[in-house]
């Protein structure tokens, strides 16, 4: 992909919270001593009275977020994916999802792209853990534009939402007039008839690159961005599989 602007979706998360915070006074942000890393420090600077640093106590943070939600607040609990989905799984399951509490979880540093932070922080199982929880929406944006749209959609959605954001800067690929984001609805980024490539998050840009390289070899690949893992856009996936006969994820 030629020279394009790159932005880390964790930075987009922080920026989106600030913009939403200006419109909605009931929006509050919680952190577990990682405001700088999760990029929610910008919200803390803008709205210090609506930011709660819970310290290195992710389980408690989820419980506090649940409590705030019962008072009419819309809390965004923010930490690394490893701690949000791993360490605090019981609280997310029992204190947030089971009673259908309106809490949004902003999980940054997902996947192996955390790099030098090491294996203890490289959470690859968060999607699997979160998607099996009844009532939990699970999503992962492909770029800055999608991340901001996702945060706004999460605020509007009534119920728990888990969002994974990345540490590394990724290309902006959705900067177009017809872009529309909707939770649970995949986006066809490239039409094709020979096979379908399905991706989300930071894998979407490489998927588009792969499709271009395949085209040079005479293979026409469809590329779908499945930004929402749950609820999955089954209709789009099945239709693409029937159309192309081959699916790569």
Pin down the residues of each PLM region.
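Thiamine diphosphate
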Residues: 1-164, 169, ...
């Amino acid at each position: 992909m030629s020279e394009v602007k790159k932005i880390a979706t964790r930075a987009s998360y922080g920026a989106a919270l600030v913009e939403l915070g200006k419109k909605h006074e009931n929006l509050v942000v919680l952190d577990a001593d990682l405001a700088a890393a999760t990029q929610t420090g910008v919200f803390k600077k803008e709205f210090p009275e609506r930011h709660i640093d819970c310290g290195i106590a992710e389980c408690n943070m989820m419980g506090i977020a649940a409590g705030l939600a019962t008072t009419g607040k819309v809390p965004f609990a923010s930490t690394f994916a490893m701690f949000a989905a791993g360490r605090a799984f019981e609280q997310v399951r029992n204190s947030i999802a089971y009673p259908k509490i309106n809490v949004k979880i902003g999980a940054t540093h997902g996947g192996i792209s955390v790099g030098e932070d090491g294996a203890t922080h490289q959470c690859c199982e968060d999607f699997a853990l979160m998607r099996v929880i009844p009532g939990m929406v699970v999503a992962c944006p492909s770029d800055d534009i999608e991340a901001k749209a996702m945060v706004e959609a999460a605020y509007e959605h009534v119920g728990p939402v888990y969002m994974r954001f990345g540490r590394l800067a990724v290309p902006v690929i959705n900067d177009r007039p017809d872009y529309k984001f909707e939770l649970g609805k995949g986006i066809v980024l490239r039409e094709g008839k020979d096979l379908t490539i399905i991706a989300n998050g930071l894998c979407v840009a490489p998927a588009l690159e792969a499709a271009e390289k395949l085209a040079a070899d005479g293979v026409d690949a469809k590329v779908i961005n499945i930004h929402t893992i749950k609820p999955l856009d089954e209709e789009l996936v099945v239709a693409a599989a029937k159309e192309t006969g081959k699916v790569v994820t």
